């Protein structure tokens, strides 16, 4: 469990690092923490001894990362933890709980069995670790306490633990959330761990071992699971902000001893006659309105004098009042448990010892339920790695190696580390008979190289160079490629060539140079290659092109083409489906032969194809084509054409759009200018535009009358004693009423569908 709420305080200061950050270091591991973590996996079917399997592979991972683990075993549990252990045993071994509860006649020794069952599990783990050559140490009490002690005195570089109690025991560097898996919430590629360094945390926030002990007393820990009721993390942190690390424990002890002092502080904090902002005599409300004479202010007062101090004192008084409700607070046994240390520093040999393959197969194989050949496959690389690391030391001592490298097979790269794959041999026959013949025969059926593959391992290149330099050097030399021979001849010195002219001439006469044979390459024929333009022009003209029998008949027909061509082109008259090769030479000749020739065909189906340039002005042409007004709109226009003409008169449209919709020029060409009234009488005023849009007919022009004096324009233009403006308005209103009546008639219609 550890100290409650401690991880939430320290987690913001943790660093997530890969496990290779621990390379070359010694780390103390709380073995009980790993075992409990494995035993709590009950959500799905797992290995019957999952804790042993998990311990083996985790330890192997640390060995591959060149980390030296030191496992710390549990000692005698403190009496303060007896209640917590009893509750854990009930939860862990509830399936084998005795039927009858313990009676008062039972002795205390029989009831308080301690960790008998758990110690048996730890003993199995110790046997596994000793066979792997890993050191196990047993502390006098809690494992995390002894691991913190080793870290505090520099025997190990850190502690791997999930229990926050190790901080209360004085651990300096703690590794939490150790993970070698690539799945789950704590997954990381290649393994990762959270690093908590108390030296950095203390320098940032003045938070050390003593404050952690106070937090354990107030919030709760393994020795007082409930803590003090009503006190949480926020209240404790406010207390830590007020006092330093070195004085926090003494302040906590004085809560019960200095009663008079805290009673006086409580009276001062609650006194209404003292301002809560500045602490001077006077109510807070009066100081806010009239000011404070001591602070020398006319309005308000100095809040920095008393307000923050009053709040911190009040928070401490609240914590004190709640804590003193517990008669044993502060519990000196808990404080001494966290601060006590072994009297002497042990002289421990924490190095990696030689693994014992035979012991692992004989004692641990049946616990893990692994066959002998599988145990050999998993354990043999551990033995070879230890031998590679300790090769220099063992050679100096003169110890005989169990296995020897035969040769290097190939280069390998493991997680970015240059490595080599080796083949080993057992010269002394130490491992003969460990694997049954039946398992060997089954292995040989699946692996073509046979039992030899069991002796293949992969080791780092730098370790092999230090352990077996001759073997590595010979392998690397065999892999070196010979230098390439220079194929390019060196240039001769011109001076030497001049000096040896006679010899050079003699060599040339003796070995005359053979003339080079020039081979003409034939071009591969291309299928239906497209000829160039010059090839078209070089061909025969019209006489050379194939002509159909129907050509004389077509020649008698009049030409109906607006292109200025003076003669027929036979290739144009042929069908597109003819099998004759497509030839455009006659087309090109027809275009370039006489470009100034006049067309002979000028009309087609009654329409003129070629027009002569207008010598006169366009306005003169319009005047010649102007007709009488009674001939306007003789033929009804299609709705689309009428709509286009209306749009050509809209001013808000751009000029390019109006010009594209205007069909005046087309009508001019056809001679139908009489159908466009706005070309005869252009629109000049908004009134003319309104007349045109609503198709308002005009009266015949009246004979010219001399304008009367003082008469308006519209009255002067009147006819039949009516004003022209009034006639215009009446006609427009009449059109609107007629449109409304048409809409009403359409609404009265009922359409019956099929």
UniProtKB/Swiss-Prot annotation:
EC number: 3.1.-.-
Cofactor binding comment, as recorded: Binds 2 magnesium ions per subunit. They probably participate in the reaction catalyzed by the enzyme. May bind an additional third magnesium ion after substrate binding.
Binding site for Mg(2+) 2: 163, 165, 222
Sequence positions that bind Mg(2+) 1: 30, 74, 142, 144
Region I-domain, annotated ranges: 130-226
GO biological process: DNA repair
Keyword Secreted: no
One GO cellular component term: nucleus
Record's compositionally biased regions (Basic residues): 514-523
GO MF terms, alphabetically ordered: 5'-3' DNA exonuclease activity; 5'-flap endonuclease activity; DNA endonuclease activity; double-stranded DNA 3'-5' DNA exonuclease activity; four-way junction DNA binding; metal ion binding; single-stranded DNA 3'-5' DNA exonuclease activity
InterPro entries the UniProt entry points to: 5-3_exonuclease_C_sf, GEN_chromo, HhH2, PIN-like_dom_sf, XPG-I_dom, XPG/Rad2, XPG_DNA_repair_N
Pfam families cross-referenced by the UniProt entry: Chromo_2, XPG_I, XPG_N
Region: N-domain, residue numbers: 1-90
Key words, A-Z: DNA damage, DNA repair, Endonuclease, Exonuclease, Hydrolase, Magnesium, Metal-binding, Nuclease, Nucleus
Entry's localization field: Nucleus
Record field: compositional bias (Acidic residues): 738-754
Region: Disordered, residue numbers: 479-533, 732-754
Names of required cofactors: Mg(2+)
Gene3D superfamilies per UniProt: 5' to 3' exonuclease, C-terminal subdomain, 5'-nuclease
Known role: Endonuclease which cleaves flap structures at the junction between single-stranded DNA and double-stranded DNA. Specific for 5'-overhanging flap structures in which the 5'-upstream of the flap is completely double-stranded. Prefers the blocked-flap structures similar to those occurring at replication forks, in which the 5' single-strand overhang of the flap is double-stranded. Also possesses weak 5'- to 3'-exonuclease activity on nicked but not gapped double-stranded DNA. Does not cleave bubble-like or Holliday junction substrates.
Family indicated by similarity: Belongs to the XPG/RAD2 endonuclease family. GEN subfamily.
Protein name as catalogued: Flap endonuclease GEN
Protein species of origin: Drosophila pseudoobscura pseudoobscura
Gene: Gen
């Amino acid at each position: 469990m550890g100290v409650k709420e401690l991880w939430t305080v320290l987690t913001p200061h943790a660093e997530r690092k890969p496990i290779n950050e621990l390379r070359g270091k010694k780390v103390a591991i709380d073995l009980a923490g790993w075992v409990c973590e494995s035993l709590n996996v009950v959500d799905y079917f797992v290995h019957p001894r999952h804790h042993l399997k998990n311990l083996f592979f985790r330890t192997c991972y640390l060995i591959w990362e060149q980390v030296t683990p030191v496992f710390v075993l549990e000692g005698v549990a403190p009496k303060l933890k007896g209640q917590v252990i009893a509750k854990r045993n009930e939860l862990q071994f509830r399936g084998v709980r005795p039927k009858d509860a313990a009676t008062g006649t039972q002795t205390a020794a029989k009831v308080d069995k301690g960790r008998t069952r758990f110690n048996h599990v730890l003993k199995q783990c110790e046997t596994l670790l000793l066979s792997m050559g890993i050191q196990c140490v047993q502390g006098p009490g809690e494992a995390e306490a002894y691991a913190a002690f080793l870290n505090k005195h520099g025997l190990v570089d850190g502690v791997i633990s999930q229990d926050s109690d190790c901080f209360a025991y004085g651990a300096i560097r703690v590794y939490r959330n150790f993970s070698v898996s690539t799945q789950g919430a704590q997954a990381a590629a290649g393994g990762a761990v959270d690093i908590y360094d108390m030296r950095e945390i203390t320098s940032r926030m003045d938070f050390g071992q003593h404050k952690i002990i106070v937090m354990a007393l107030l919030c709760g820990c393994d020795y007082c699971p409930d803590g003090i009721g009503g006190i949480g993390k926020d209240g404790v942190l406010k207390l830590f902000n007020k006092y330093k690390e070195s004085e926090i424990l003494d302040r906590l002890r004085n809560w019960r001893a200095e009663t008079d002092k805290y009673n006086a502080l409580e009276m001062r904090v609650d006194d209404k006659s003292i301002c809560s902002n500045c602490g001077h005599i006077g109510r807070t409300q009066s100081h806010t309105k009239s000011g404070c004479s001591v602070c020398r202010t006319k309005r308000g007062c100095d809040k920095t004098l008393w307000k923050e101090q009053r709040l911190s004192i009040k928070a401490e008084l609240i914590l004190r009042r709640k804590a003193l409700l517990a008669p044993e607070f502060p519990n000196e046994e808990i404080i001494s448990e966290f601060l006590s240390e072994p009297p002497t520093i042990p002289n421990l040999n924490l190095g990696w010892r030689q693994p014992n393959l035979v012991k692992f197969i004989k004692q641990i194989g049946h616990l893990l339920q692994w066959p002998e050949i599988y145990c050999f496959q998993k354990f043999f690389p551990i033995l070879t790695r230890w031998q590679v690391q300790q090769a220099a030391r063992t050679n100096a001592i003169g110890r005989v190696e169990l296995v020897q490298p035969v040769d290097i097979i190939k280069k390998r790269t493991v997680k970015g580390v240059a490595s080599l794959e080796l083949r080993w041999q057992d010269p002394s026959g130490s491992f003969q008979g460990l694997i049954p013949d039946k398992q060997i025969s089954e292995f040989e059926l699946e692996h073509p190289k046979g039992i030899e593959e069991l002796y293949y391992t992969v080791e780092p290149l730098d370790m092999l160079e230090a352990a077996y330099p001759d073997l590595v050097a010979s392998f690397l030399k065999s892999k070196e490629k010979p230098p390439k021979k220079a194929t390019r001849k060196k240039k001769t010195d011109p001076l030497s060539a001049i000096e040896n002219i006679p010899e050079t001439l003699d060599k040339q006469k003796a070995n005359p140079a053979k003339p080079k044979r020039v081979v003409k390459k034939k071009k591969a024929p291309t299928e239906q290659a497209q000829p160039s333009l010059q090839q078209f022009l070089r061909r025969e003209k019209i006489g050379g092109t194939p002509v159909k029998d129907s050509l004389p008949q077509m020649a008698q027909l009049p030409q109906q083409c607006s292109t200025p061509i003076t003669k027929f082109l036979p290739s144009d008259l042929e069908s597109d489906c003819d099998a004759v090769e497509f030839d455009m030479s006659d087309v090109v000749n027809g275009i370039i032969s006489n470009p100034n020739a006049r067309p002979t065909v000028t009309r087609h189906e009654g329409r003129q194809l070629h027009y002569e340039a207008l010598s006169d002005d366009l306005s003169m042409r319009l005047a010649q084509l102007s007709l009488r007004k009674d001939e306007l709109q003789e033929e009804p226009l299609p709705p689309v054409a009428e709509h286009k003409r209306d749009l050509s008169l809209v001013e808000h449209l751009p000029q390019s759009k109006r010009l594209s919709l205007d069909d005046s020029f087309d009508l001019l060409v056809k001679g139908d200018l009489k159908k466009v009234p706005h070309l005869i009488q252009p629109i000049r005023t908004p009134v003319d535009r309104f007349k045109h849009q609503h198709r308002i007919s005009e009266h015949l022009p009246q004979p010219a009358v001399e304008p009367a004096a003082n008469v308006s324009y519209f009255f002067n233009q009147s006819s039949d004693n009516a004003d022209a403006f009034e006639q215009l308005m009446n006609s427009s209103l009449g059109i609107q009423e007629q449109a409304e009546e048409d809409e009403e008639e359409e609404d009265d219609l009922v359409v019956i569908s099929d």
